[in-house]
From Swiss-Prot:
Reactions catalysed: Endohydrolysis of (1->4)-alpha-D-glucosidic linkages in polysaccharides containing three or more (1->4)-alpha-linked D-glucose units
Cleaved signal peptide residues: 1-20
Record note on quaternary structure: Monomer.
Protein name: Alpha-amylase-related protein
Species of the source: Drosophila dossoui
Cystine crosslinks: C48-C104, C157-C171, C376-C382, C418-C441, C448-C460
Keywords, alphabetical: Calcium, Carbohydrate metabolism, Chloride, Disulfide bond, Glycosidase, Hydrolase, Metal-binding, Pyrrolidone carboxylic acid, Secreted, Signal
Site positions (Transition state stabilizer): D310
PTM-bearing positions, type Pyrrolidone carboxylic acid: Q21
């Protein structure tokens, strides 16, 4: 009987931890993460204070924080080739990172770190030098900055069969030296690294290449982590939020379902399908059942996004900033529809897969600069600063915890729906105008369309819609309009 009770206690404790690891630890009604890809820590701190907090963002995913190899030309992917766990990168040093985390937490913005637990750097010709000056010999699996030696890695082999579990989880992903997470020593170094970040005040982690690690090893590592630091405003016994990169198209041996109880999982099918729909390859009317009915994960397990730093560089259905009208429509739908844990992308301009972030002649990352409207101008795209996107972050806050209702469509690519009595969204992806009296579900009054303008000092700088006592309003979205979407909510009532 004692053994059964002990087993039950351990099982319940494990379930409790895994549920806690799905909690992003947001402040108030905030509920959108932005990925400030390759930004410097000092710039993120200022962005938290001056832009993200005032506009209701909930958190920031930051690029990898630990020392990485220096690659010729400084491509973005060098950040994903670690050689030690020292907190020095082109984004800044440990002091600057800690200052950023503190300042962002102070204004209610949580920090989630992209962490590399699967591997160290790939082969390098001779001795490699990292961003903190550490030397390593990746070809010999020698990383004295940790330290790791060859015995801490799986034997070298190549992934040639993605349906072979051994290859996927113990061979080298694109030549990156594959750590043995089943080793007590390797586990201890990874836990030490993550716990240090927790001590500095981070709220959680995006786990890169999670499918290339056995779920039972990750379960042990996650379960061994410290609780979040209460000195940064987290409640007692709060667990780090975990979201794991698992690319699962539904036909491979290693499945997302092995990981979704450990934490949230990046729902790549969401990204692919929303791209198909707003590129016109699937009618928007079918989006009424968007979510788990499409074969996606359950809402509380899914980290959702239109694009990410990887797939925005690939060809195919995924939308990115280079198709701005469709991208803004897709993002508006993403943030308005009640499904998933939402993350928006903030990119830099790229011409090819390897384009580095904006940098000076000495290869130092440069700070974003802004025009009079607050848009970025010097190689940074900053989608999160587009009015049509940050306004939808405010919309999502206004409609939090409300249900989808009042769905309407024209049988094709014009749709609208309500979020309770708090918000209304309409989209026109047809080649003709949407002009229709529609149920907005909102209380009677005049509302500012937060896509075409902003509510400033009681006046709307864009379109406005008058809602009658029955909740109906006249909605017009011309086929030639730049945005193709209209959004109203109770916090934008004139």
């Amino acid at each position: 009987m004692f053994k059964f009770a002990l087993a039950l206690t351990l099982c319940l404790a494990g379930a409790s931890l895994s549920l806690a690891q799905h909690n992003p630890q947001w402040w108030g009604s905030r509920n959108t993460i932005v990925h400030l890809f390759e930004w410097k820590w000092s710039d993120i701190a200022e962005e938290c204070e001056t832009f993200l907090a005032p506009r209701g963002f909930a958190g920031v995913q930051v690029s990898p924080v630990n020392e990485n190899i220096i690659s010729a030309g400084r491509p973005w992917w060098e950040r994903y080739q670690p050689i030690s766990y020292k907190l020095t990168t082109r984004s800044g040093n440990e002091e600057e990172f800690a200052d950023m985390v503190r300042r962002c937490n102070d204004v209610g913005i949580r920090i989630y770190v992209d962490v590399l637990l699967n591997h160290m750097s790939g082969d390098f010709d001779g001795v490699a030098v990292g961003t903190a000056g550490t030397e390593a010999e990746p070809s010999k699996k020698s990383f004295p900055g940790v330290p790791y030696t060859a015995q801490d890695f799986h034997p070298s082999c190549e992934i040639t069969d993605w349906n072979n579990r051994f290859q996927v989880q113990e061979c080298e992903l694109v030549g990156l030296k594959d750590l043995n997470q089943h080793s007590d020593y390797v586990r201890s170094k990874l836990i030490e690294f993550l716990d240090h970040l927790i001590e500095l005040g981070v709220a959680g982690f995006r786990v890169d290449a999670a499918k290339h690690m056995a779920a039972e090893d990750l379960e042990y590592i996650y379960g061994s982590l410290s609780n979040l630091n209460i000195e940064h405003g987290f409640p007692h016994n709060a667990r780090p939020f975990i979201f794991q990169e698992v690319i699962d198209h539904g036909h491979e041996t290693v499945s997302r379902d092995e990981y979704n109880e450990l934490g949230a999982v990046t729902e790549f099918r969401f990204s692919e399908e929303i791209g198909k729909a707003f590129r016109g390859n699937n009618a928007l009317k079918w989006l009424q059942s968007w979510g788990s009915d499409w074969g996606f994960l359950n809402s509380e397990q899914a980290l959702t996004f239109v694009d990410n730093h990887d797939n925005q560089r690939d060809h195919g259905s995924v939308l990115n900033y280079k198709s701005p009208k469709q991208y803004k429509m897709a993002t508006a739908f993403h943030l308005a529809y009640p499904y998933g844990i939402s993350r928006v992308m903030s990119s830099f301009a790229f011409d090819d897969h390897d384009t580095p972030p904006p940098q000076d002649a000495q290869e130092n990352i440069i700070s974003p600069e802004f025009d009079e409207d607050g848009a970025c101008v010097n190689g940074w795209i900053c989608e999160h600063r587009w009015r049509q996107i940050y306004a939808m972050v405010g919309f999502k806050n206004a409609v939090r915890d409300t249900e989808l209702s009042g769905w309407w469509d024209n049988g094709d690519n014009q749709i609208s729906f309500c979020r309770g009595n708090n918000g209304f969204l309409a989209v026109n992806n047809n080649l003709y105008d949407l002009s229709q009296e529609l149920n907005t579900c909102l209380p009677a009054g005049e509302y500012c369309d937060v896509i075409s303008g902003s509510l400033i000092d009681g006046a709307c700088t864009g379109k406005s819609v008058t809602v009658n006592e029955h909740g109906y309003g006249y909605i017009h979205i011309g086929s030639d309009e730049f945005d193709g979407v209209l959004a109203l909510h109770v916090n934008a009532k004139l």
